[in-house]
Amino acid sequence: MGRAALTAADTRVTVAGTAAGAQCLIDGDPATELLFDGSPEAVIDLVTDADMDLRNITVWPARRPIRAEAELQVKGADGYRTIASFGIDRSNPNIEVGFDPYAPVSVSVAKTTGREFRLIVRGAGKDTGFAEVLLSSLPRVERYAEKTFAKMFQSPLPYWEEYQWRDQPALDDASLAVDPAKVVDITECLDGDRLVWEAPAGEWVVMRTGMRPTGIQNSPAAPEGTGLEVDKMTPAYLQHHFDAFIGEILRRIPAEDRRTFRVVVADSYEKGGQNFTDTFLTDFRERYGYDALPFLPVYDGVVVGSQDISDRFLWDMRRLAADKLAYAHIGGLREIAHKYGLTLWLENYGHWGYPGEFLQYGGQSDEVGGEFWGEGSLGDIENRAASSCAHIYGKRKVSAESYTSAGNDFGRYPAMVKPRGDRFFSEGINNTLLHVYISQPGDELPGMNAWFGTEFNRNNTWFSNIDLFTA
């Protein structure tokens, strides 16, 4: 098999079209980075003195946004030939589109033997770059960061195929995959920060894993109402979240004084993925009939069973997450609202990476709504998602957060935004929620306004004629 991976001790790295210091790409230190100089193409050559059997390339981007196309080549008797072509998209570092902003890009290749490899990077742009490039004879799960929600689609409008990944090359040597039957849980052997374990004979890899928050916070919100996003997969936490927000309103306003308080609103989902919860292992076994614990290394790209089996486990995980988002989170929120005589109104779609399904998700709410902006393309899929959900689940009213915007304060007027409204009313929207109306109790101009939304309020010069627009 040869060496397991190319390292700084046995490999020479050169890069055409960029500065010196390319050896940092294989020094094992993600803090050292090689930046490109803006040339249309960067050519990275990795040369070693002995053959290796390549099965995976993993690229760690430098900690700055990058989008590029890459080709991996190997040199043979007839020169270089391409063995893998792949995209690198870490263009949006917001954790709402992946809680690991610069997650590694892992690509599998069929076993390829060689000692001279070339990585061609096109379109990366100036001052983007890589921290590490790992060529390995050991297999890894392809695109494991994307498949675990650590890195999600980078722009607002993912198409269906964006979460449909190719079949990985089958392993030529099954012994290179971890046997799930040989994964041992040694949690009980931990004594504080020490591991006290009588390991059976053989070679073992000890992996420590755990659960932590994604770090994503709710927004937009007042400072005193801002904190970590609630767990979407455990109903008990949702009840606590409801009590801390809506519960405060219910406690402070007597029931006889809140006759107009009837609806709880959940906005569009823009808070990234979640791939674990306290009850995940129990829930997983109940759903699928097998134990997820031996497959936890797959979260870090380790192949367990086979490439295909590892992918199937990750599919099951994502399916469970989507179901929990629909039934535990939205279904749970609806049930809690009903206990207080309230109903749930939901924008049943997600932006910038969304771990659920629009129709299933929306079906658990009392009412659904879409959204559209007065200009641009935002809204092109959201309103069909809402109207389709309403048709399927028998919901007669289909609302939309309407005519929203950003910037150009007081620069919009009805004739400017009307074409967008006409379009989405023809796609099934039959109830509009003007975005945004803010009460103006004072007479100072321009009054109180948000940075988002068209100013539907009495301080706008055309507001006295708004009935001609909304009638």
Positions of predicted regions on the chain:
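Carbohydrate-binding surfaces of carbohydrate-active enzymes
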Residues: 1-24, 34-37, 46, 52-56, ...
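Extended low-complexity, serine/threonine- and proline-enriched intrinsically disordered segments
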Residues: 4, 68-76, 169-177, 181
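Active-site-adjacent "subsite" loops/lids of carbohydrate-active enzymes
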Residues: 24, 97-102, 153-252, 281-321, ...
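Extracellular beta-rich ligand/substrate-recognition surface
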Residues: 31-42, 94-101
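Short, hydrophobic/aromatic-enriched beta-strand segments in well-ordered soluble domains
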Residues: 46, 118-123, 206-211
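Beta-sandwich interaction modules
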Residues: 86-127
